[in-house]
Amino acid sequence: MSYTASPCQELVEPCAVHAEGMAQEESHRSQAPPTFYHGASQELDLSTKVYKRESGSPYSVLADSKMSKPHLHETEEQPYFREPRAVSDVHTVKEDRENSDDTEEEEEVSYKREQIIVEVNLNNQTLNVSKGEKGVSSQSKETPVLKTSSEEEEEETEEDATDNSSDYGENGRQKKKEKQVEKVRVTQRRTRRAASVAAATTSPTPRTTRGRRKSAELPKRKKRAAKEPKAPVQKAKCDEKETLTCEKCPRVFNTRWYLEKHMNVTHRRMQICDKCGKKFVLESELSLHQQTDCEKNIQCVSCNKSFKKLWSLHEHIKIVHGYAEKKFACEICEKKFYTMAHVRKHMVAHTKDMPFTCETCGKSFKRSMSLKVHSLQHSGEKPFRCENCDERFQYKYQLRSHMSIHIGHKQFMCQWCGKDFNMKQYFDEHMKTHTGEKPFICEICGKSFTSRPNMKRHRRTHTGEKPYPCDVCGQRFRFSNMLKAHKEKCFRVTSPVNVPPAVQIPLASAPAAPAPAVANTPTSPAPAVSMNPVGSALPSRPVPHPFSHLHIHTHPHHSHHLPIPPVPHLPPPPALFKSEPLNHRSQSEDTFLRHLAEKNSPAQAQHH
């Protein structure tokens, strides 16, 4: 019997071990929700479930066929419809579970290992699922109901971190296991708290407790919904970014980067006036602008001429006060100017169009300014006023020449010789005499000149043109100075001498002597003629002389013109005739007077 008992003993031991393992798996798979609150240290009664004895001998074993497929019978269980335990039973189970921490940790580890297969539901809720198809425990279904939104977000972030991790080595697995164990502990603690609260406040039916739990969840979900209006806040922030305004100018930018770029380029390099907002590159320009109070005209320091813009002052200083050069030339006549704007104005002179017409006289002009100056002749307006003496002038150059009276010298003065000029044109021509510059060349002989008028004057020597006629004799001259000299000579011969309107002509008697022969030359003076044969003088009577230039003299040695003082406050009258006919007419007048004297002499003799 001993020989037969030993092999039977060897057969029983592995079966018992296998039965214990099967029983543990069965306990894990077939754990109903109420058994979750029992102590994990309870021993399994395998005498009734695993095997049974047929006889009194301890080695007779009969294996139960139902142990092979325990999970097929567990599917019929419905954990949600079992009767709930009393409150006292829950407290006792809780105390038993606290006393058995070691066994609970082992079960949690094994239980969590089975959950690695499925962790997230379609609703993004964490589920504690076993290996079987319907092995979902009641705890796992109740736990997500009691979770808050913040805790769910934490778990989701942890799950995302675990899903995105690409380290599938041993270290990664260990970390996953540790995290899963922590999750299980957290969920168990939450279920304990929920069970204690539900047992104290709920009715015996589980459905009502569930309904209350769902009603308790609603404010939590509302809290989460309250967090959703983050989008309008972000939109408001975007709006704030879109309305970034510059502090120094009214420009608006979408991003801060563009605003900083605008500040660096515009405001940190440019100088801006605080009053009117004008920009200046240099601080000196800004200070000059502020001295004019942003509205007054900018004046030149040298000549007190006012300008509206600063660049106009710069151009004026270059051109007028003598450190600029004429670099821009006309393509047609090669005339040079200081600026290109002056060249454009000059190009109008080469066109034939004259669109500006005077309404009064019908004269046409090429420029509007020329028409405006011309219209002053008809209106008699004098728009240019002297600020010192309030005298007004019709043209601007007249005012400039007048200002030399107040200044003490003319506006443009040569620094080399001290000669001053009223016109800039004359000043420029004079300055070329010092520099030796002669840019104007005659096309015929190649001679050069300092100014264009001088070249035109020289060209008349080649063309024979004589544009200056004499008003008295009609003779024409090539130059104006020649006409001036001719007028002085011509008027010296024909210049009248003023006499009183009534001239007394005494006809005195002369001694009886043979009268000298009258010269036939027109310039010889006529001798005195005795009008009375008796020798008595005729009574004096006023005779209005029709010719103011004719005088009769009694003495033969007197010259033709007597030094008669002119009449004060009266201008000399113009000459009526030329010199030669006047002398011939003088002879005819002498004969006419003699004839009158002869007629009157017999009547006077009879009277006496």
From Swiss-Prot:
Protein localization: Nucleus
Compositional bias annotation for Basic residues: 548-561
Alphabetized Pfam families for the sequence: zf-C2H2 (PF00096)
GO biological process: regulation of transcription by RNA polymerase II
Bias kind Pro residues: ranges: 563-575
Acidic residues bias: start-end ranges: 98-108, 151-162
InterPro entries per the UniProt record, alphabetical: Znf_C2H2_sf (IPR036236), Znf_C2H2_type (IPR013087)
SUPFAM superfamilies: beta-beta-alpha zinc fingers
Gene3D superfamilies referenced in this protein's UniProt entry, alphabetically: Classic Zinc Finger
Zinc finger boundaries on the chain: C2H2-type: 244-267, 271-293, 298-321, 328-350, 356-378, 384-406, 412-434, 440-462, 468-491
Superkingdom classification of source: Eukaryota
A GO CC term attached to the entry: nucleus
PANTHER family for the chain: AZ2-RELATED (PTHR24409:SF295), ZINC FINGER PROTEIN 142 (PTHR24409)
Subunit text: Interacts with CBFA2T3.
The family this protein is said to belong to: Belongs to the krueppel C2H2-type zinc-finger protein family.
Name this polypeptide is given: Zinc finger protein 652
Gene: Znf652
